[in-house]
Amino acid sequence: MTSQRSPLAPLLLLSLHGVAASLEVSESPGSIQVARGQPAVLPCTFTTSAALINLNVIWMVTPLSNANQPEQVILYQGGQMFDGAPRFHGRVGFTGTMPATNVSIFINNTQLSDTGTYQCLVNNLPDIGGRNIGVTGLTVLVPPSAPHCQIQGSQDIGSDVILLCSSEEGIPRPTYLWEKLDNTLKLPPTATQDQVQGTVTIRNISALSSGLYQCVASNAIGTSTCLLDLQVISPQPRNIGLIAGAIGTGAVIIIFCIALILGAFFYWRSKNKEEEEEEIPNEIREDDLPPKCSSAKAFHTEISSSDNNTLTSSNAYNSRYWSNNPKVHRNTESVSHFSDLGQSFSFHSGNANIPSIYANGTHLVPGQHKTLVVTANRGSSPQVMSRSNGSVSRKPRPPHTHSYTISHATLERIGAVPVMVPAQSRAGSLV
């Protein structure tokens, strides 16, 4: 058998060749990094089986700072180039002469805002098959700006301080390294460093902590430094005058407050005492009327004692001071007495023939030879009222007494004067 070639075979081969020769954009490197201010080349190549008469190329960018707003970078269409967004004017162009299968572009004087994702869209009619988009990422690197160094905290000896270092710009984000500019280039033993945050914490600073410190900010494309002078302050003598003044002022204030409190207390106490005194009853009781006859006088001997003596008097209406009864002269019971020392006195008539005088119920004897009987009691026993021969007396209990008599002549010689005294009620009030 002989094989026969089909007449359709060449047409099939041409058809397969056309499919294989359709437009295809080459793989991109993925990402390109460039320092700010340096030119960047974004590659994009393709293959096609058709002529480049109808070539159409569009470059688009999706900014990193605003992913929702894609922008046109450059356009080639119908044999002409057109500018894209205003910020790319004068900085963007194709690397080769157009039309060509290499549609790469360049960006001069790259800026931080140029960072983003770039897309290359290629169309060349009649080729319509295959992948016609290429994607390239652009990252504009920024070296660290000059860092700013500062000290946070008190620089007094024994305190804790924090050294801060930061750069406003830097892509990628810079790291920070602190060092002390001395022979060892090492930080103090009490220091802890955070290279990401750019801080150094030095605890319990001392004189050895003083010195010049340097912060180095660095990233992939550059470094930058700043210097910081740390001077630990030694203790200063305090102002004794200010301290003494403050203490004195505080003491005066405290004393004033204490005096104010004491004054208020004593005022309150005296006020309460006055109110209590006002509540105590002070009644004067009248036991009986005074004698109606002015000529009739009752004589009363008043003796004061310096040691807790109490004066009492006999009743002018119920007692007989003077009597012509001889028994009266021998009666030693007292007419009046003093309670504490126990001394009591009685007046008696020395002449029984002298007539007695009664005035308003009172028996008076104005004769001569009058005597005074004194009864002394050394005890402190309570006293009771007693009545004997018309005379009223208080005698102590128990009755351990010593009596003696004072003659009328002796009374006249010492200047004794008969007086009238008010009587006492049972409650002790004078009337």
UniProtKB/Swiss-Prot annotation:
One of its GO terms (biological process) is regulation of presynapse assembly. Residues 23-136 form the Ig-like V-type domain. One of its GO terms (molecular function) is ionotropic glutamate receptor binding. Glycans are attached at N102. The modification Omega-N-methylarginine is found at R378. N-glycosylated. It is found in: Cell membrane. Residues 144-234 form the Ig-like C2-type domain. PROSITE patterns: IG_LIKE. Its main location: membrane. Residues 263-431 are cytoplasmic. Keywords: Cell adhesion, Cell membrane, Disulfide bond, Glycoprotein, Growth regulation, Immunoglobulin domain, Membrane, Methylation, Receptor, Repeat, Signal, Transmembrane, Transmembrane helix. Abundantly expressed in testis and ovary and to a lower extent in brain, kidney and skeletal muscle. The keyword Isomerase does not apply. Residues 379-402 are annotated as: Disordered. The chain crosses the membrane at residues 242-262. Functions as a cell adhesion molecule through homophilic interaction. Stimulates cell growth. This is Immunoglobulin superfamily member 11. It comes from Homo sapiens (Human).
